[in-house]
Amino acid sequence: MRLTDIEIEQALDNGTIVIEPRPNNDAISGVSVDVRLGGQFRVFKDHTAPFIDLSGPSGEVQAALDRVMSEIIEIPDGEAFFLHPGELALAVTYESVTLPADIVGWLDGRSSLARLGLMVHVTAHRIDPGWQGKIVLEFYNSGKLPLALRPRMTIGALNFERLSGPVARPYNKRKNAKYKDQQDAVASRISQD
C-alpha cells in the first residue's frame, strides 16, 4: 500500500526513510514528498559516435558511451541549465534518499512541467528497496521552446509503497548494483550488464 502523508512524516521522523536534507512539511502532500533539482548535469555530445550497439561487447559499448557523454556540468545556484527541444540530459536530485528493504519508491514528474513538454524520467522511475543515494533524472524536452532548469527548483515527487516483507536482495547489498551510493549525474553503465 502507498504511504500517506502521515505515514511519510512518521517514516522520516523515525528514520525508516531518510531524505537529506530533510524536506519541510510543505513539501509533503497526500501521498508524496517533493524533490528538488540538484546542480549537476550531463549531456550527449552531438555526432561523436555513429551509433551505440547496446548488445555489443562491453568494451565497445563503454567506449561509445565515453565518446558521447559530457563530463559533469555544474550549475551554480541562481544560474540556469537550458534544455533545448529534442534534447536528452541527465541530472540529479538535490536530495539524497535512503530506503529500507521493505519499501519501494516511485518518482513522478510534475504535471505542470509535463504540460510544458518536460519529461523528468524517461522510463526509470522505480527506487528499489535498499536504495541509498541521489536519484538520477533523465530529462527530455518534447516541447517547442528551450526550458531553463535551475538548481533547487521542485522537479518531481516521490511516493512510497510498503511491501509485504523485506526483499532478500536490497539494492545496497547487491554486488552487481551499478548505481550504488550515487551522488552525481552518473552516466549509463549498461556496459556492466
UniProtKB/Swiss-Prot annotation:
Keywords of this entry: Hydrolase, Nucleotide metabolism, Nucleotide-binding
Catalytic activity: dCTP + H2O + H(+) = dUTP + NH4(+)
Binding site for dCTP: R110, S111, S112, L113, A114, R115, D128, V136, L137, E138, Y171, K178, Q182
UniProt keyword Aminoacyl-tRNA synthetase present: no
EC number from the UniProt entry: 3.5.4.13
Active site (record annotation): E138 (proton donor/acceptor)
CDD domains registered for this protein in UniProt: trimeric_dUTPase (cd07557)
Superkingdom assignment: Bacteria
Residue ranges, annotated region (Disordered): 171-193
Biological pathway: Pyrimidine metabolism; dUMP biosynthesis; dUMP from dCTP (dUTP route): step 1/2
Coiled-coil spans in chain: none
Signal peptide start and end residues: none
GO MF terms, alphabetically ordered: dCTP deaminase activity; nucleotide binding
GO biological-process terms attached to the record: dUMP biosynthetic process; dUTP biosynthetic process; nucleobase-containing small molecule interconversion
Gene3D superfamilies: 2.70.40.10
First-level EC class: hydrolase
Function: Catalyzes the deamination of dCTP to dUTP.
Stated family: Belongs to the dCTP deaminase family.
SUBUNIT field: Homotrimer.
HAMAP family recorded: dCTP_deaminase
Entry protein name: dCTP deaminase
Organism of this sequence: Shewanella oneidensis (strain ATCC 700550 / JCM 31522 / CIP 106686 / LMG 19005 / NCIMB 14063 / MR-1)
